[in-house]
Amino acid sequence: MLPFWIALQFLSSLPVSLPGMPAPREVGRSLLYYPLVGLLFGLLLWLASHLLQGTPSPLHAALLLTLWVLLSGALHLDGLADSADAWLGGFGDRERTLRIMKDPRSGPIAVVTLVLVLLLKFCALWVLVGQGIGAQLLLAPLIGRAAMLGLFLCTPYVRPGGLGQALAEHMPRRAAGWVLLVCVLFCLFLGGWSVLLALAVFAWLRHLMCRRLGGTTGDTAGALLELLELAVVLGLALGL
């Protein structure tokens, strides 16, 4: 179970202690458990939504979104902000884009992107709360983290060194394919057209990454997760 705890420590703000530095092989295997971490997030959000029944819809949605951000420690929002700054400021140049991504400062494009994404997610949750949100809360966190597994499976990792390279090099590819298949079938059963929308957004974002960078980085993987979660909740709110 060590790979699961590695995944949970990396993807969440939950207090997880590991017994020492994990081997690269265990780090690579942790990718297989990313969807399970997403499912855990979805279950916690579902439970919170159940406990918040009777709360005014705007407050209900705001508290759900706050819990959602806190569970991940805003890790992927940081990747989204860095990617937004780099994509606009990179002017189509690969090296400039990668260099801006490493800059810890956030520019106005990053701030505007974060505000818009959080605003849209809040509005979508507000609609879903009004409709009697249920098991659909499982979908977005699960799809977002399964997409990270899919991205590392089919996309080169372009920034040498660090955790991302260990994930990409030591991921058990055959097992990853089976995990993704199970996730897709489960999500299609639960979410229908919203899942197809997420797949389309995944393909489009991956195309943009490959065209600009020749692959992915940790920041663009985080941005992918956030944008796919947004696509799913928007699709559900629109009745897809």
Swiss-Prot record:
EC number of this enzyme: 2.7.8.26
Predominant localisation class: membrane
Molecular-function annotations in GO: adenosylcobinamide-GDP ribazoletransferase activity; cobalamin 5'-phosphate synthase activity
Pathway: Cofactor biosynthesis; adenosylcobalamin biosynthesis; adenosylcobalamin from cob(II)yrinate a,c-diamide: step 7/7
Catalytic activity as recorded in UniProt: alpha-ribazole + adenosylcob(III)inamide-GDP = adenosylcob(III)alamin + GMP + H(+); alpha-ribazole 5'-phosphate + adenosylcob(III)inamide-GDP = adenosylcob(III)alamin 5'-phosphate + GMP + H(+)
Top EC class for this record: transferase
One GO location term (cellular component): plasma membrane
One of the Pfam families matching this protein, by short name: CobS
GO biological process: cobalamin biosynthetic process
Full protein name: Adenosylcobinamide-GDP ribazoletransferase
Species this protein is from: Pseudomonas putida (strain ATCC 47054 / DSM 6125 / CFBP 8728 / NCIMB 11950 / KT2440)
